[in-house]
């Protein structure tokens, strides 16, 4: 006899009899439901991954992801040299002086974030500089490179001057408290096509430190580039050098990324309900089949099949629906996600050449498929147990 017999009979029940078209339709309906649920889940989460990655590249990639600073407000690089900054998940370290500033031009006033950088070390904004070089930020010249949106808001062009004020570095005078301020020369702009164009500005690190009224040679801290910026929670828990403190992007953009993550989780939860409904469909269809097959189950028991084997027969039938549906759904979902930007213009959803960011994560697709299979398998337990509990004498009494 074909071994294992439970697998053979379970697959036969899955196919159904040729004459019983409605029974076969109900049996395959569960498979279709799981396929659609997994496909929708893979497609939507791939798009959400794309949005998350785009935000990470366009925002976190262009701003300080983390800063290792001193508890005293400014850091002396001699006391904590770059070689002492050895942290997990950090791939690059550079000095930085940064702070929130108020910008005043002849036409307008704006707020921004000053990034004091070393002109000799390449900055993430360097590829986006417009008609200016990073090396033009010479110390003592008080030159500044503005984001294009920020320059437009201030109404300034190359060659103009703006007043930069630091409210946190104010000084007391007979006329009251006056913020530290200095005139800077606009030598160019950068256009990263990101929101940082509206508030970031680049200056020489020495000029920035003088404006912040730091002791000579001091900086705000060491700028850290992270391997995985979104996993900053775990990175911030590691042991830091003595006397230092950790600051990261969550101070400025934590709420934005938390909202994106929550939206992604909620979309995943809602679409998981499709898989849950399909799982209930497995329970229903399998329960009806158990009632229909009670006579056959009794005959199988009289032929020597144990209750465990009877249970396996119906578990194979129900689980096969989940396995087939999960594999088909994962494959179709990945295919749909990869071709989404080609299909959207056909139905007129995307206009003007816009495209959805899509990032298919193989591990995520595999996890979704495995979870769908597990849900389908769990949904077979009760009907299969009911089938195994069938009493042959009772079932055959009216046959």
UniProtKB/Swiss-Prot annotation:
Could you state one GO biological process linked to this protein?
lipoprotein transport
**Mode of membrane association:** Multi-pass membrane protein
Protein task:
Part of an ATP-dependent transport system LolCDE responsible for the release of lipoproteins targeted to the outer membrane from the inner membrane. Such a release is dependent of the sorting-signal (absence of an Asp at position 2 of the mature lipoprotein) and of LolA.
**UniProt similarity note:** Belongs to the ABC-4 integral membrane protein family. LolC/E subfamily.
The gene designation is: lolC
Gene Ontology CC entries for this record? ATP-binding cassette (ABC) transporter complex; outer membrane-bounded periplasmic space; plasma membrane; plasma membrane protein complex
Q: Which UniProt keywords apply?
A: Cell inner membrane, Cell membrane, Membrane, Transmembrane, Transmembrane helix, Transport
Taxonomy of origin reads: Bacteria, Pseudomonadati, Pseudomonadota, Gammaproteobacteria, Enterobacterales
Can you say what this protein is called?
Lipoprotein-releasing system transmembrane protein LolC
Q: Give the primary localization class.
A: membrane
Q: Where in the cell is it found?
A: Cell inner membrane
GO: which molecular function terms?
A: lipoprotein releasing activity
Q: Which residues cross the membrane?
A: 25-45, 270-290, 310-330, 358-378
Recorded hits in InterPro entries, A to Z, give: ABC3_permease_C, Lipoprotein-release_system, LolCE_TM, MacB_PCD
Question: Which source organism?
Answer: Escherichia coli (strain K12)
């Amino acid at each position: 006899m074909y071994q294992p017999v439970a697998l053979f009979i379970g697959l036969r029940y899955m196919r159904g009899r040729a004459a019983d078209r409605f029974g076969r339709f109900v049996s395959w309906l569960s498979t279709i439901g799981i396929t659609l649920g997994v496909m929708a889940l893979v497609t939507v989460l791939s798009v959400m991954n794309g949005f998350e990655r785009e935000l990470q590249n366009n925002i976190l990639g262009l701003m300080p992801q983390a800063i290792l600073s001193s508890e005293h407000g400014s850091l002396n690089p001699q006391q904590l040299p770059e070689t002492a900054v050895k942290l997990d998940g950090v791939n690059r370290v550079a000095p930085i002086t940064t702070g929130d500033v108020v910008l005043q031009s002849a036409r307008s006033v704006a707020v921004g974030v000053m990034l004091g950088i070393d002109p000799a070390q390449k900055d993430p904004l360097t590829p986006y500089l417009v008609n200016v070089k990073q090396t033009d930020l010479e110390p003592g010249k008080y030159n500044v490179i503005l984001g294009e949106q920020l320059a437009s808001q201030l109404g300034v062009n190359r060659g103009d001057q703006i007043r930069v004020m630091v409210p946190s570095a104010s000084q007391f005078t007979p006329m009251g408290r006056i913020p530290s301020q200095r005139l800077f020369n606009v030598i160019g702009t950068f256009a990263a096509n990101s929101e940082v164009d509206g508030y970031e500005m680049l200056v020489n690190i020495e000029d920035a430190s003088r404006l912040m009224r730091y002791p000579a040679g001091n900086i705000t801290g060491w700028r850290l580039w992270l391997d995985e910026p979104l996993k900053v929670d775990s990175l911030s828990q590691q042991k830091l050098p003595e006397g230092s403190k950790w600051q990261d992007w969550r101070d400025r953009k934590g709420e934005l990324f938390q909202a994106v993550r929550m939206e992604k989780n909620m979309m995943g939860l809602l679409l998981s309900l499709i898989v849950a409904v399909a799982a209930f469909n497995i329970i229903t269809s399998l329960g009806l089949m158990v009632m229909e097959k009670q006579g056959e189950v009794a005959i199988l028991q009289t032929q020597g099949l144990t209750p465990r084997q009877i249970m396996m027969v119906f578990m194979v039938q129900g689980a096969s629906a989940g396995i087939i549906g999960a594999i088909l759904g994962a494959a179709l979902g990945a295919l749909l996600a990869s071709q989404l930007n080609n299909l959207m213009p056909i139905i007129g959803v995307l206009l003007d050449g816009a495209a959805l960011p899509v990032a298919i994560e193989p591990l995520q697709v595999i996890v979704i498929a495995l979870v769908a299979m597990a849900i389908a398998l769990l949904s077979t337990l009760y009907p299969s147990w009911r089938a195994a509990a069938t009493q042959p004498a009772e079932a055959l009494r009216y046959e």
